[in-house]
Regions:
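N-terminal capping segments
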Residues: 96-203, 227
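...with weaker cross-activation on analogous glycine-rich loops/strands in unrelated enzymes
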Residues: 6, 185-235
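Short, charged beta-turn/beta-strand-edge "cap" motif at the junction between a beta-strand
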Residues: 17-22, 93-97, 229-232
Length: 235
C-alpha cells in the first residue's frame, strides 16, 4: 500500500517539507496530507496558486475521467485525464485563435497548470471537447444527480488509493459528491465524522430493531460507514 491517495490537476497544495534527497515533498491538500514525488508538482507563490483555484469562469468535470484532446505541440497536456469533480478555469484566449495548433471552435479552452523545467508553476491552454461530460458549475446536490454521477463509474476497476487508474470506496464517494460542490475528506475514518455530513452514529447500546428502523429511513445517496469501508445507498 505504497500509494494511499491521489491528487488532481489544479489541486492547490501547501509544500510543508522536502526529503533529504530532494525527490519528495510533503504536501497538504484540501483532502489529505502525504508525500508526493517532487516532479509531480509545480511550486508557485500563494497568491498565484489560490487565484487559479478560485478563478471564474470555469468548467467542472462531471464525467468519470474525460481527457483533453491530443496535441503534439503541448505533450504535457495531450490527452490529460481529468477526474470527476475537478474544477479548471477557462483560459483567457481569443475564441478564434489556434490552441496548440488546433481551432478551438468545438472545445472549451482550459487553463491548466504545468511544471516548468525548474519546477516552477506555469499555465498553458488545453482543449476539452464540448461533447465531453463537463459543466459550467457544480451540479445541483440532488438525489437524482447522486445516482447519475455514481453510475458513471459502473464497471471501473477497483483501485486502492486511486491505483490502477481507478478508485476505492472513499475516493468514489468523494468524487461523486465533489461534482456537486461538496468536499469530503479522502479516507473513510475522516469522512465518517466530517461536519459536511449529517452523522448518525450506531453504538453498541442499539438493538437490532433500533438499527433496522434507522436503515429504513435511509435515502438515495446516503452513506454507510463501517470500519475501513463506505457504501452508498441506491434504493
Amino acid at each position: 500500500r505504497f500509494q494511499e491517495s491521489a491528487l488532481f490537476p489544479g489541486d492547490p497544495l501547501v509544500v510543508a517539507h522536502a526529503s533529504a534527497d530532494g525527490k519528495w515533498r510533503f504536501v497538504v491538500s484540501p483532502r489529505y496530507a502525504a508525500w508526493v514525488e517532487a516532479e509531480a508538482i509545480a511550486e508557485g507563490d500563494r497568491a498565484t496558486v489560490l487565484a487559479h483555484a478560485t478563478r471564474a469562469p470555469y468548467r467542472v468535470v462531471t464525467g468519470a475521467k474525460p481527457r483533453t484532446v491530443f496535441t503534439r505541440e503541448e505533450p504535457r497536456l495531450s490527452e490529460l485525464q481529468l477526474d470527476m469533480g475537478t474544477r479548471i478555469p477557462l483560459a483567457p484566449a481569443a475564441p478564434n485563435a489556434p490552441v496548440n495548433g488546433q481551432h478551438p471552435y468545438a472545445a472549451w479552452i482550459l487553463d491548466l497548470p504545468v511544471r516548468d523545467a525548474d519546477g516552477r508553476l506555469g499555465f498553458a491552454p488545453a482543449l476539452m471537447p464540448r461533447i465531453a461530460d463537463t459543466a459550467g458549475d457544480y451540479l445541483p446536490l440532488t438525489r437524482a444527480n447522486l445516482l447519475r454521477q455514481a453510475f458513471k463509474f459502473l464497471g471501473e476497476r477497483y483501485g486502492w488509493g486511486h491505483s490502477y487508474n481507478g478508485r476505492d470506496c472513499s475516493g468514489f464517494v468523494s468524487e461523486v459528491y465533489r461534482s456537486m460542490g461538496v468536499l469530503l475528506p479522502r479516507n473513510t475514518s475522516a469522512q465518517a465524522v466530517s461536519p459536511a455530513l449529517n452523522r448518525i452514529a450506531l453504538d453498541a447500546s442499539m438493538d437490532h430493531e433500533q438499527r433496522l428502523r434507522l436503515m429504513k429511513q435511509l435515502q438515495v445517496g446516503d452513506l454507510l460507514y463501517i470500519p475501513g469501508h463506505v457504501m452508498m445507498v441506491i434504493g
